């Protein structure tokens, strides 16, 4: 039985109980839970399609993921789907790590030893260093066993059974607190930490260069545990988006696309879209870029000086902060069967061509007096080296689900971390299209060296997504995929796991926030978690409001 009854019929057609802005996984999660409680909820999305950075698109019969290449459960994703009554089949998604001609597949924790053996073959002068680093990885994996040792209680039925409380939840909470303290002692940047273990910069870069810049040590090393948790939804990552959409609509929720919120009047609780639509609300959830949120608040209509001061403080706090590294992705359609790529890369691979890594390559090489050079040759030569010594993440959907490419063909998704400001600079120099062609040819060349000679002859179509195109599409600061950069000092948002419930609150009581900009480190599981926490906070406030209006009798 639902605790809430929608007030839709008693108010104008432009009034809703809750407006959710942004249809990424955080917004979809929150809307699903709010609609489940029969609140009158409206989800607004500025693009023509929902899903944000999660989901896929179809090109000539190939289904290609636009964001996450796979799904990490983290004790959150599968319990969330189960709680909502959504049944999705998840397929195997083994991770390969390939460096030069050396390769391993991570299937269980014992494979970390094989990873260490591979590193020792590549760097025989650093065997003792590698042994120490392996112990660090295994130490973090043990902490992860506790942190994700049970399914997140937030997504389990309540009230909890006594047996679960006494034998599972309470013992886990005790261990959780102890291990979060251990985790908090490992928040130095991963490269700095590894320099206390080895002086081989190539070894350091090979381990870390596919992580976001300045990633804290614990979160970087925890990926060796998370790699074992990767799964792939049958039908592509779009399956999750479609199932959540279907649930929202079946529960009476509403979704409107091509509606970009341009103004929020926090006093009258009204929003206005760029398309001229106006809505009033009781509660609002912002599940999009934080900078954009504070920019669309109409400060002229705020009567409370205290509230205005808090909002202006937030604006100032975020104005010079940078988003995390963005990603450049090349989508390639090949007239070759999947097995040509399967033996080398598998369905999901981190492929590094050169064991030297990015140790001798830096953005500073193409900067002068803090500005990027305008010398085209210098820029393109640097990009060539950057790709050659970098780590490419290669995802091949058809190797997980054979229905995702036409028979005898393969769709490849090849990506690497890339700097937003550099792409913006190339665009300003009118080199954007040439840059995309250049980097595509580099990717194909390196894939060809590992797979099929003259691979370019078999590639019949390519599409390139850059940090700039991500920023234009999503309005995410600097085209970020995972919120704020760890390099920001001070860090602009909450990062302490024990305070994550508070992260969804904003200075405005009637507005909550969720998604990658709300809590770091961000990703699909954390975005889902903040979406659920935000929906719980909204439901609590709505219950409180209805209780006051009815004198509390219905809720005593």
Predicted regions and their residues:
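Mid-domain catalytic core of redox enzymes
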Residues: 233, 242, 262-267, 272-406
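N-terminal glycine-rich phosphate/pyrophosphate-binding loop and immediately adjacent elements
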Residues: 6-149
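Extreme N-terminal leader/targeting segments of oxidoreductases
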Residues: 1-18, 36-37, 505, 546-556
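A conserved FAD-binding loop/helix module that cradles the flavin
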Residues: 68, 516-538
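Active-site/ligand-binding neighborhood in enzyme catalytic cores
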Residues: 138-251, 258, 476-492
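Glycine-rich, aromatic-lined ligand/substrate-binding cores of catalytic
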Residues: 326, 332, 348, 390, ...
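A glycine-rich dinucleotide-binding beta-alpha-beta segment and adjacent secondary-structure elements
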Residues: 200-211, 389-395, 453-520
């Amino acid at each position: 039985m639902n605790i809430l009854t929608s007030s839709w019929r008693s108010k104008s057609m432009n009034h809703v109980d809750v407006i959710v802005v942004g249809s990424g996984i955080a917004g979809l999660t929150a809307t699903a839970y709010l609609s489940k409680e029969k609140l009158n909820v409206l989800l607004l999305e500025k693009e023509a399609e929902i899903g944000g950075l999660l989901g896929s698109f179809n090109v000539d019969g190939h289904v290609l993921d636009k964001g996450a290449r796979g799904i990490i459960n983290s004790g959150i994703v599968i319990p969330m789907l189960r709680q909502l009554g959504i049944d999705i089949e998840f397929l195997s998604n083994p991770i390969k790590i390939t460096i030069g001609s050396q390769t391993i597949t991570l299937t269980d924790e014992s494979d970390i030893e094989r990873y260490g053996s591979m590193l020792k073959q590549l760097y025989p002068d650093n065997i003792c260093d590698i042994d120490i680093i392996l112990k660090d990885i295994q130490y973090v994996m043990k902490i992860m066993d506790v942190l994700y040792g049970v399914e997140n209680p937030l997504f389990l039925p309540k009230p909890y059974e006594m047996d679960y409380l006494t034998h599972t939840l309470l013992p886990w909470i005790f261990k959780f607190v102890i291990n979060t303290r251990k985790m908090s002692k490992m928040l130095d940047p991963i490269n700095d930490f590894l320099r206390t273990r080895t002086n081989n910069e190539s070894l350091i870069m090979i381990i870390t260069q596919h992580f976001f810049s300045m990633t804290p040590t614990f979160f970087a090393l925890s990926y060796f545990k998370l790699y074992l948790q990767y799964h792939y939804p049958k039908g592509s990552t779009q399956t999750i988006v479609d199932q959540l959409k279907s649930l929202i609509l079946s529960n009476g929720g509403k979704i409107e696309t091509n509606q970009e919120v341009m103004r929020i009047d926090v006093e009258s609780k009204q929003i206005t879209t760029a398309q001229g639509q106006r809505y009033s609300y009781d509660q609002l959830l912002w599940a999009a870029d934080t900078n954009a949120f504070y920019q669309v608040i109409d400060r002229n209509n705020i009567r409370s000086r205290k509230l205005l001061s808090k909002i202006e403080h937030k604006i100032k706090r975020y104005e010079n902060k940078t988003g995390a590294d963005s990603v450049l992705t090349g989508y390639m359609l090949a007239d070759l069967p999947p097995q040509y790529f399967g033996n080398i890369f598998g369905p999901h691979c981190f492929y590094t061509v050169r064991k030297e890594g990015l140790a001798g390559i830096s953005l500073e090489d193409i900067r002068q007096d803090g500005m990027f050079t305008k010398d085209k040759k210098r820029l393109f030569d640097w990009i060539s080296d950057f790709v050659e010594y970098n780590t490419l993440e290669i995802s091949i959907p058809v190797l997980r689900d054979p229905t995702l490419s036409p028979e005898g063909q393969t769709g490849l998704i090849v990506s690497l971390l890339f700097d937003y400001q550099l792409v913006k600079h190339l665009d300003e120099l009118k080199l954007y299209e040439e840059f995309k062609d250049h980097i595509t040819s580099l990717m194909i060349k390196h894939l060809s060296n590992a797979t099929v000679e003259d691979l370019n002859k078999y590639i019949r179509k390519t599409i390139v997504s850059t940090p700039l195109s991500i920023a234009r599409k999503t309005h995410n600061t600097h085209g970020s995929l995972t919120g704020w950069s760890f390099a920001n000092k001070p860090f602009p948002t909450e990062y302490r796991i024990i305070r994550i419930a508070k992260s969804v609150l904003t200075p405005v009581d009637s507005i909550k926030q969720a998604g990658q900009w709300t809590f770091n480190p961000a990703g699909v599981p954390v975005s889902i978690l903040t979406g659920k926490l935000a929906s719980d906070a909204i439901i609590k406030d709505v219950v409180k409001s209805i209780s006051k209006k009815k004198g509390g009798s219905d809720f005593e």
